[in-house]
Each structure stands twice: as C-alpha cells, then as structure tokens.
C-alpha cells in the first residue's frame, strides 16, 4: 500500500495547520479501503484562491471548505493519480468554530470527505449522501474522532 501525498501550502500564515504527518495518516486511513495505491495533491489555500476556484468550476461566488478535482486518465492508461484536494483554511476554521468541533477533527473530516469525492462518492442524491456520510463517520471514528454529522442527527 502506498498513498503518496504532495502537500502544497499556499497560505500567508502556516501556523495552526495540520502537519503533513496528520494529513498522511488521514489519507492512509481512508484511501486503501478503496484502492491500494494512490497519488494526490492536497493544497491548503486562503479565501481568495478558494473563492476564485469555486466560482470558476462550480459557479458559486464564495469560498468553500474543500474542492475535489478527480484526475481522469485517458482510456487504456492506468495511473494511481487520484487528483487534487483544495482546502480553504479560513472556511475550515470558521466552520469548526460555528459547529463547536475541535479544529483538528474538522481538518481530518475535510481530508476524508474530499478523498471520498476523488474516489467517486458524492452527496447530491439522498441515498448517495447517506452512504457517503456513513463512510465518513466510520473512517473518522476509526481514527478516534467523533461522528462529524452528530449535530445534524
């Protein structure tokens, strides 16, 4: 099993961010359930970059917590490249505070959530959302975190 992380920190202030080891652990607890080897980029950004990408790719004129950009290899070519996760520091921090969650737990949840998107999971339809949230809860609890959706239940 090999999950290769390319961590990019595109923020003005790197203090208080999860460590590369934290992010690697979260990926190692998520991805191997679905595929043995993977390579992905996790880019932590400030509000401006998140806002710009969310507007350009999703038509939403605001920053968001996590954006997932799956990589699709051309037909006949097999690569372990999953894609890119773009996580907005300020949105994650604000959500953690608003939801009274430990900040590290919310960072972990965003990495798990985004990774599942890269693996093909979605939450547009209710049944898809239920399956994805169930997986997220299971993975988060396996790492010692609370159910990230506990406030919604």
From Swiss-Prot:
Signal peptide: none annotated. Zn(2+) binds at residues 113, 117, 123. One of its GO terms (molecular function) is zinc ion binding. Binds 1 zinc ion. The keyword Plastid does not apply. Its main location: cytoplasm. Its cofactor is Zn(2+). InterPro entries: MetalPrtase_cat_dom_sf_prd, YbeY, YbeY_CS. Its EC number is 3.1.-.-. Belongs to the endoribonuclease YbeY family. This is Endoribonuclease YbeY. It comes from Vibrio atlanticus (strain LGP32) (Vibrio splendidus (strain Mel32)).
């Amino acid at each position: 099993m090999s999950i290769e992380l390319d961590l990019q920190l595109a923020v003005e202030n790197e203090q208080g961010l999860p460590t590369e080891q934290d992010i690697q652990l979260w990926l190692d607890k998520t991805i191997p359930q679905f595929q043995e080897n993977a390579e992905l980029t996790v880019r932590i950004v400030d509000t401006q970059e998140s806002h710009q990408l969310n507007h350009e790719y999703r038509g939403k004129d605001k920053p968001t917590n996590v954006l997932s950009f799956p990589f699709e290899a051309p037909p006949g070519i097999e690569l372990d490249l999953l894609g890119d996760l773009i996580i907005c520091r300020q949105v994650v921090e604000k959500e953690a505070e608003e939801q009274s969650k430990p900040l590290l737990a919310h960072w972990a949840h965003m990495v798990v959530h985004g990774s599942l998107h890269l693996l093909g999971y979605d939450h547009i339809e209710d049944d898809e959302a239920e399956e994805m949230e169930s997986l997220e809860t299971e993975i988060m609890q396996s790492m010692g975190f609370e159910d990230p959706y506990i406030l919604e239940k």
